[in-house]
Amino acid sequence: LYLAAYTLTDQRVVDELIAARDRGVDVAVLVEGGPVGGMTERQATVLDELTAAGVDVRVMTGDAARFRYHHPKYAVADDTAVVLTENWKPAGTGGADSRGWGLTTTSARVADELAAIFEHDTTWQDTPTWEAVREEIETVEAEAATGSYPQHHPPVSTTADNLTVLAAPDNAESALVERINNTDDELLVIQPSIGDRDYRLLRAAIRAADRGVEVRILLSGTWYAEEENTALAEQLRERAADDNVPLNVRVAEENSRFGKIHAKGIVADDTAVIGSLNWNDNSAENNREVAVAVTDDVVADYYREVFIGDWQAGGDGGGFSLLPSDELPTGLVVVAVAVISATALLAKRWLVFAER
């Protein structure tokens, strides 16, 4: 059982990892040693707890680290894998703040590919054990999110065969550009923020609109991103109006469905892409990121429905008429190839994270 994380503080997840280890399962965890703002005291306590239980806890850290940040959010249990946009903490998998997306798949091929990434990332000098670096890492105090949001998007299941693992700094950005370049009808993008107007993936989305693809981009309105996101949205809407192209951008405010946008995904015709990749150069070129692309009508329609509901619930301008409003569910998202928006669902014999 492997779990890859940027941050890890969700006690339910920790308890299940320890329970698996107590059953004799080989359990390994890899986390980022220097997340933005510093490692929290809560996370240090969690890593102590896991180590004491016999879990192999590794930390990506040091001047020789291969990646700027170890930023993926995935888990592998036998031949089942979970890939998330959300961190393993109350605000993310705990359902207490962020809108996120996620996917559970029983594809042995996908599980094997993710396991290979995990093993590659944990077998070098920049991933020492937690015990070895515990005294070197300074921690900070931080309060956990405590919000509560109803879930109105039940999981859906499908038998999708076309799944592709994407990783940065390897193939993720180029694969997404290719996918966007091949989009014919509709492109939906959800991101906390976008690096700048000239970012490669944004340019691909603008080109799609220029050739007639209906493009919608939903960004976060949280305090640390609102000003830049609003400015970008206004620039792109003005450009779309001047050129009369089907491009709209909206900044989502906090609402009854979520506290902030944290999902990183697209729906491009019948393909959905879910993962940790932010739309900026650092994420694509310097971080370890993981995503999965799924070509399947059921999955694409599910995320599309969630996107539209979020667009209508908390935007700052621009209409969206792809579905009548009375057909749209509201609330948090969980999908079982599965979508997850604030709660992690890994349904295999080693782990069960209860939906709430």
What kind of feature is each model-predicted range?
Residues 59-61:
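Histidine-dependent nucleotide/RNA phosphoesterase domain, centered on the 2H-phosphoesterase fold
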Residues 56:
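Short, basic/aromatic beta-hairpin or loop at an interaction surface
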Residues 2-53, 66-70, 76-356:
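Charged, low-complexity intrinsically disordered terminal segments
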